[in-house]
Amino acid sequence: MTLKTKTNKNINIMNSKYALPKDGGLIADVALQELTQRFERIATQVYENEYDGVNYVADNIVAAIGAHKADRPFALGLTTGKTPLGLYRELVRRYNKGEVSFANVAVYSLDEFYPITPAEAQSRNYRIHEELLDHVDIRPENINFPDGTLPREQLSKFCAAYGHNKIDLMIVGVGEDGQVGFNEIGTHANSKTRLVQLSYQSRKVQSGAFGGLENTPKMAITMGIHTIMKADRVIMMAWGEDKAKIMSRVIEGEVTSQVPASYLQNHSDIEVVIDEGAASQLTRVQTPWLVGPCQWTPKFTRKAVVWLCGVVKKPILKLTYQDYLENSLGELLEQGRTYDQINIDVFNDLQHTITGWPGGKPNADDSTRPVKSTPFPKNVIVFSPHPDDDVISMGGTFIRLVQQGHNVHVAYETSGNVAVHDDVVLQHMDAAHELGFADEFAKVEEIVKSKKAGEPEPRALLNLKGAIRRAEARSAVRSFGLNPDTNAHFLNLPFYESGGIRKNPFTQADIDIVVKLLRDVKPHQIYAAGDLSDPHGTHRTCIEIVLEAIEVVKGDEWFKDCHLWLYRGAWMEWDLGSVDMAVPLSPNEIIVKRHAIYRHLSQKDIVPFPGDDPREFWQRSEDRTQTTAKQYNDLGMAEYQAIEVFVRMF
């Protein structure tokens, strides 16, 4: 997509620019499709990104509605949550273009919280109306939702009737534990529409929208597995790397009540539609040499050899001919190199990713180094989605770049204001009260008391929270020698400032802010968060904005010497098969990095949106980098205390 306008029109993030360059892998061949999918128990379509997958599902829905000739409305089952949002927007777009009508369609929502009213913004009823139904020509009498307002004594009768009519096409998503709707772990295959108790994990996932776990419903009404199985046809969707682990179990694992979505393997007409992130742990993606012929590039060869080392528990240079043959890598031995030459080549390839000079070592032979020695010093921009991602995810490298004399700038893309507890604000204002600003403390206390669960926070409170996070970020970079007054940039990208968990789509205004910074600094190196999995969604939006900005500046003279390095956040790390640069950290550098993370006091201990990992961010960061160092050591490299790794996008 090329930008041709300066308007603030929303950018379609599904049509993503963010995809790592393809480098080797399974050879696509229609004739071999049955072979390459032989581990999969459900017909599965893998698309490069959500945009392509959504279009495929939308094509199927539009075609099914158009082909429906019965005298009753076409019955369409709708899933809820984040997964279908892109699909609903695409269906609205097609309706507006005159490609589909919903006048003869009846919809059935998969689930609803209980108790809840349709007017509450967190209800499934409200969200599906907001995203789809309010924008198309569906008849009100054809809209069906579980009724979250019914008295308990009326629910059994309601549930006995709900969703048991003929459903022509059922669209479902999959929860991170394999839930379909609110069919939790342990659900029986014969379950029907019913009231269910929500698990702690499900309530925790939903708690952000409700303003905390204490405000999140403990129950829900959901179609059961048996109800879903009665649909004529089912399409299951999943997007993003955070769904990869569960989708591998749903698609390739045994049918089990521990993964309720796996029951759908037994449906006679089901299809799974996922993007490459959600497919990343399928056998044909993770270990494609087990299923078919491959293109053996140097980096793909490294991926296979690193995997083999893990299987046989040996370092690279100890792998034998038999190790390759007995673990389905015979094809690699047929590419013109002996096994020991492959070992040496991969060892050298991986070793050459290691450097203590992330900005390039001046006056040194750089023929095998990941970064050129010239120019020196380099102009560098570190993009940080939230005000602490820079030090959490690449703090050691950041410190090295500063201490080695480069002109380093850090750009905090969002304010991070919603991730500050109210108590933290009151604590800061209490200090102000001690200094004589009693009126201000009282005002803030009133603002906090006026908040309503699930509604956007008051702007005055968000401004205070943003100020707290800016002060913490300045303190962190000051701790290792960066001047925050000249080299720390708080972009406050507008898309983030919704006041709630759900952010606005990014627009040209966001892109223009990043473009200006790029042209001001003219960086030789750009570091950006390349997370494919992010419980907030902010990281993904931020990398898309950076890439859109790069599209604008790529014709500038300075850009020809620029390279983009991707780091990962506090959730996952790059696979060693894809790493382009590895920066080792000494024990002292880990302490300096940890102390920088400590400066983000509002994010210590308990934070509003911690994800599933109970550890503090500094602990996650250290465990992640120390695990990477151990992986390098296990492969036969030098033993380091910790290593931060990066992938070069260009």
For each predicted feature, which ranges?
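N-terminal glycine-/serine-/threonine-rich phosphate-binding loop
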Residues: 2-75, 365-367, 374
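ATP/nucleoside-binding phosphotransfer catalytic cores, i.e., glycine-rich phosphate-binding loops
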Residues: 3-24, 36, 226, 232-330
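Ligand-binding beta-strand-loop-alpha-helix segment within the catalytic cores
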Residues: 24-41, 100-171
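Glycine-rich N-terminal segment of FAD-binding domains in flavoprotein oxidoreductases
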Residues: 67-99
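Active-site beta-strand->loop->alpha-helix modules in alpha/beta enzyme cores, enriched
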Residues: 161, 313-387, 391-560, 595-599, ...
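Short, surface-exposed, charged loop/turn segments at secondary-structure junctions
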Residues: 176, 181-198, 251-254, 540-549, ...
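Class I SAM-dependent methyltransferase SAM-binding "motif I" and its flanking Rossmann-like core
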Residues: 177, 181-225
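A conserved mid-domain beta-alpha-beta active-site/ligand-binding segment of alpha/beta enzyme cores
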Residues: 571-628
